Amino acid sequence: MTLSTSISTFAQIQDSESIRPIRDSIGFCWNAEEMNYFMKFLSTNNPDVKPIPQKLVAAISVHDDYLYAGNVYYPLYQNIKTKEVVIFGVTHGSVRKELGPQSNVLILDDYTKWQGPYGEVEISPLREFIKSKLPKDNFIVSNKAHSIEHSIEALIPFLQYYNRDIKITPIMVTQMPMEKMEDLSNRLSDIINEYAKSKNLKLGEDIFFLISNDANHYGEDFSNSPYGMDANAHKLATENDVRIINQDLVNKISNEKIYQTAKDILPDSSNKFTPLWCGRYPIVFGLMTISKVVKVTDDNVLFGKLFKYSDTFTEKVLPVKNTSMGLTAVFSYKHWCGWFTEGFFLNKNN
């Protein structure tokens, strides 16, 4: 091997390592033609879904398999029309198993680009701005963590379908107590506001916030079956999900509502039943951060609108054939997952 060949090979290896690899090649769609076909199916399957009149500034998205949750993803993404998106993702057990317990920090990555079905996805300059401004004990940088985690990549094909030039700031949120979330969200919102002001970015037009979350993971595989494992248990558990959403996350989003959300979905030392939402920390931390960004940049307040709630047992498998998409888990009364999509917009503070 010549020196020039060796240098070229090394450069190719470095370049490939700087692009985040796809974690889930089964549950999500990474082929442009297949994504186009899937979106056409969803459009036909959801003829009454139209863009909403309000300009969204933030949202909560499902991150489960597309063949299960496609109808729940679909109503949201046509309403996201910004240049860049901050994505608050989960730190799943698979990450903690590999890296050990992670808490009280945000996890950022160091990749130059992420993969998408329509080409590589650029990283927003905001990520490096956050690294330069946030105290070092508030975050870690781990490509390994981001390469294992699937909750952020799940959103990229839908984002990229509507905007081929989308830029992202991927942020994994770890477990942390409320006082830590308050402190860290104060710091992060100040940094985001400084960045947005320096770039003259407007909420909902130039920059957007997306929270990745799946609702209750129910059944014996999750050690989570307080109502039993039959049709009535499924009814009670899904009704509880919807109750929490309508009570805590719809209409005006106040600080009191964010704290009530935390009481309803975060585990504590008591023996009360807490539904197993895997995006519980991203939801609470994300809403804290977003509400503080809104408070500084606008006289309006945040309002939430539910697009759709469903679950694997209700939706079952979408009849989309001849694609590379598949399922990463089975469903039954002993194993199902709830999900929802919701948008947040600004409204007058009356």
Model-predicted segments: where are they?
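Bacterial N-terminal signal peptides
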Residues: M1-S6
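Sec/Tat signal peptide C-region and signal peptidase I cleavage site
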Residues: I7-A11
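Long, Lys/Arg- and hydrophobic-enriched amphipathic alpha-helices
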Residues: V293-N349
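Active-site histidine-anchored catalytic micro-motif
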Residues: Q12-V284, M288, K292, T297, ...
